[in-house]
Amino acid sequence: MELAEKDKGRDFTLRNARMDDIDQIIKINRLTLPENYPYYFFVEHLKEYGLAFFVAIVDNSVVGYIMPRIEWGFSNIKQLPSLVRKGHVVSIAVLEEYRRKGIATTLLEASMKSMKNDYNAEEIYLEVRVSNYPAIALYEKLNFKKVKVLKGYYADGEDAYLMARPL
């Protein structure tokens, strides 16, 4: 899938990630997030969930990505305990100079659509640092709700919000 997007005068292209994008994805991960994963972790997720793993391209370079996975587990949003197929946003990042241009929103929307249509997920969830106000605002704009606080979730001891929404 390849989509051309225009937002605030910036052109970017969204497409499914490929193996030859992994090095650029890892570079973005290391530059923008304190949570870093080994090479094989990205490769496994791309092989297993590639239809929902997207990159944003500007001038032939990857400037953002979303890496998901699909899981079976208890619903994060239903009142009564029930097992559901759900999408999990493992990692999403956009290079700082390309933020606030609609790239993260577009990445999330494309991945959510694929999780629902290609993987039959019923809901989606993610974890976000309680101090990451811009990300929380983005997720709330996309109708994610704070489900609970995960105390000491991150390696540095910071708490996370678990946020979720139906697909």
From Swiss-Prot:
Pfam families: Acetyltransf_1
Effect of residue 100 to A: 7-fold decrease of the affinity, with no significant difference in the catalytic efficiency. Same fold compared to the wild-type
Record's keyword terms, sorted: Acyltransferase, Cytoplasm, Metal-binding, Transferase, Zinc
Effect of residue 35 to A: Slight increase of the catalytic efficiency for Ser-N-terminal peptide, but 4-fold decrease of the affinity compared to the wild-type
Effect of residue 34 to A: 20-fold decrease of the catalytic efficiency for Ser-N-terminal peptide, but almost same affinity compared to the wild-type
Effect of residue 88 to F: 2.5-fold decrease of the catalytic efficiency for Ser-N-terminal peptide, but almost same affinity compared to the wild-type. Loss of acetyltransferase activity for Met-N-terminal peptide
Residues noted as binding Zn(2+) in the record, renumbered to the chain: 88, 127
EC number of this enzyme: 2.3.1.255, 2.3.1.258
Catalytic activity: N-terminal L-alanyl-[protein] + acetyl-CoA = N-terminal N(alpha)-acetyl-L-alanyl-[protein] + CoA + H(+); N-terminal L-seryl-[protein] + acetyl-CoA = N-terminal N(alpha)-acetyl-L-seryl-[protein] + CoA + H(+); N-terminal L-methionyl-L-leucyl-[protein] + acetyl-CoA = N-terminal N(alpha)-acetyl-L-methionyl-L-leucyl-[protein] + CoA + H(+); N-terminal L-methionyl-L-glutamyl-[protein] + acetyl-CoA = N-terminal N(alpha)-acetyl-L-methionyl-L-glutamyl-[protein] + CoA + H(+)
Entries under InterPro entries matching the protein: AcTrfase_RimI/Ard1 (IPR006464), Acyl_CoA_acyltransferase (IPR016181), Ard1-like (IPR045047), GNAT_dom (IPR000182)
Principal cellular location given in the protein's record: cytoplasm
Consequence of substituting residue 127 to A: Same catalytic efficiency and slight decrease of the affinity for Ser-N-terminal peptide compared to the wild-type. Loss of acetyltransferase activity for Met-N-terminal peptide
Site residues, Plays an important role in substrate specificity: 35
Entry binding sites for substrate: 37, 154
Subunit structure: Homodimer.
Role noted for this protein: Displays alpha (N-terminal) acetyltransferase activity. Catalyzes the covalent attachment of an acetyl moiety from acetyl-CoA to the free alpha-amino group at the N-terminus of a protein. NAT is able to acetylate the alpha-amino group of methionine, alanine and serine N-terminal residue substrates, however it has a preference for Ser-N-terminal substrates.
Protein's name in the database: N-alpha-acetyltransferase
Source organism of the structure: Saccharolobus solfataricus (strain ATCC 35092 / DSM 1617 / JCM 11322 / P2)
